Amino acid sequence: MATYNFDKIINRKGTNCLKYDYAVERGKPADVLPLWVADMDFTVSEEITKSLHAAVDHGIYGYTQPKDAYYNAITNWMEKNHNWKTKREWIMKTPGVVFALGAAVKAFTKPGDAVLIQNPVYYPFTNIIRDNDRRVIDNTLVYEKRVTEGKSQYSIDYEDFERKIVQEHIKLFILCNPHNPVGRVWTREELQQLGEICLRHHVIVVSDEIHNDFVYPGFEHTVFANVDPRFAEFTVTCTAPSKTFNLAGLQISNIFISNETLREAFQKEIDKTGYDEPNALGAVACEAAYRGGQEWLDQLRAYLLENLNFLRAYLQEKLCLLYTSDAAD
């Protein structure tokens, strides 16, 4: 069993790194702590590095079409880590989850239609809706401080959720599961309630589950499409190795759509963009990550939990009160 050194400090400045170099270009101090972007300062797993080295040494980076090994790595990962049995034909590749969100908005709504989100949420949700001339409708999450427990909790206002769907004739809901940035890991019961409402009103759900592998002990990620077979029929599930394995710059994501009609509509929008084959090295890294990255991820999550516990204790001492969340958003 390999032991990974997450204490190693790697200087990313001056490497065209968006996280650090962008801040300096915008006039921020050179020593600024860039907490605004979700990539990590850890090197990737040995399995990924070795696979990329082999691909680079081959010396040709032509058009790429992943085969069975790629799809098997992904489906096996989903079954092992998320108790979700999937099929190869459900998987559609895009260069990123935000790209997929845009394709879904165009595939399943028309200009002027309303799209439902749950603020406070990852800001590209709003941008991608407005940039495609759709209307943003907000089912704002309800925030509750539990002072005696030193915790905070966001919850869903289901009455408002259904009311907005009816009043605004919602056709598409973009779910963030787990929720970024509030860190809620939605329970099966919460997702069941959302799903029943969407089923009742024929609302398509696009579930952004890119943070599905970052859940703290005591919590369990539930794939929305796996809550109920009926929900799978109207769900687009967005996943990627980018957050889990620190691969954002390799531009690859895997979108699961079990309903053939939805899949064809989504593919039509992808075709309109001219996107076809994935990034050659991105495909290699994705397969390697899902095939052999479990040990690295297990050690990473333990390390991140130690960081969280340190930060919690430090802020509790200095600020006297701290509210924590379920996931590492």
Language-model segments: what does each one mean?
Residues Y61-E196, F214, H221-N226:
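Conserved core of the PLP fold type I
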Residues F234-Q316:
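PLP-dependent aminotransferase class I/II
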Residues A114, L172, I204-V205, V236:
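Hydrophobic "anchor" residues on beta-strands that sit immediately upstream
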Residues I91, E209-H211, A328:
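Conserved Walker B
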Residues A2-G96, A289-G292:
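N-terminal small-domain helix-loop-helix segment of the aminotransferase-like
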Residues N180, D208, K243:
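Conserved G/P- and acidic residue-centered "switch" motifs that form tight phosphate/ATP-binding loops
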Residues Y323-D329:
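Conserved small/polar residues in nucleotide/adenosyl-binding loops
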Residues R134, R200-V203, A232-E233:
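A short helix->loop->beta-strand "cap" motif at the edges of active sites that frequently abuts
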